[in-house]
């Protein structure tokens, strides 16, 4: 499960889910054992993390949409993802 970014204790991962339940491009954000799945459109698909951190994740997704979509395209081709600048 490739880590594509980390900020404020949040780990952002993106991986290919063959036959998975989420049919849209998305990321997984983990914070202290809790996880939220967020589409690249910024919609929460599943789970939750503390509200303030979830807002940071959604903002980060919006800022980095193009890079995230490029990573998703790489995954679809079976290629390796690249890291994305964290929030500062």
Outline where the language-model segments fall.
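Short, charged, low-complexity patches
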Residues: 50, 54-58
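C-terminal structural segments of small proteins and small subunits
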Residues: 58-88
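Intrinsically disordered, low-complexity boundary segments flanking structured domains
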Residues: 1-2, 25-27, 70-71
């Amino acid at each position: 499960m490739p880590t594509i970014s980390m900020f404020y204790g949040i780990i952002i991962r993106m991986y290919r889910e063959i036959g998975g339940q989420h049919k849209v491009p998305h990321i997984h954000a983990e914070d202290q054992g809790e996880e939220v799945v967020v589409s690249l459109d910024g919609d929460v698909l599943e789970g939750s993390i503390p509200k303030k951190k979830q807002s940071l994740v959604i903002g980060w997704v919006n800022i980095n949409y193009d890079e995230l979509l490029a990573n998703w395209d790489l995954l679809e081709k079976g290629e390796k993802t690249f890291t994305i600048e964290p929030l500062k």
